[in-house]
Amino acid sequence: MGDNHQATLSNDPAANAPDAAAADKGKGKAADEPSLEMSMDEEEDSDESEAEEMVNDDDDDHDNLEPISEENIISGGRRTRGKTIDFQEAAEKLKAEDEMDDEDDDDEEFQPNDEDMRD
């Protein structure tokens, strides 16, 4: 049989399938993942998102958003390009505001009790 170098045709449908050779190569059919793994991933994602939401809630408390000064609002729709700014005056104004804020600080009045700091 094998001496005459003729091809032997097989009637096996699995061997002659058009994608039989391609299944072992690079682009085969994608394997279905078990549904248990998907549910575990979904649970992990929900836990992570809950943790992120808790962290984001804390960030809202620490925002130092000061109210907008009405002096900075330009009426009439004018543009601010080309406006000359007196930085000296602005620095003095900020310095005066900072001095007023320093009067309210309680840190200067704090005196630690040395007895509490012992090992």
Swiss-Prot record:
Chain intervals with Basic and acidic residues compositional bias: 22-32, 83-97
Similarity field: Belongs to the CHZ1 family.
Subcellular compartments: Nucleus
Record keywords, A-Z: Chaperone, Nucleus
SMART domains in the cross-refs: CHZ
Function: Forms a chaperone-bound H2A.Z-H2B complex that acts as a source for SWR1 complex-dependent H2A to H2A.Z histone replacement in chromatin.
Protein name per Swiss-Prot or TrEMBL: Histone H2A.Z-specific chaperone chz1
Region feature Disordered, mapped onto this chain: 1-119
Superkingdom per UniProt: Eukaryota
Bias kind Low complexity: ranges: 11-21
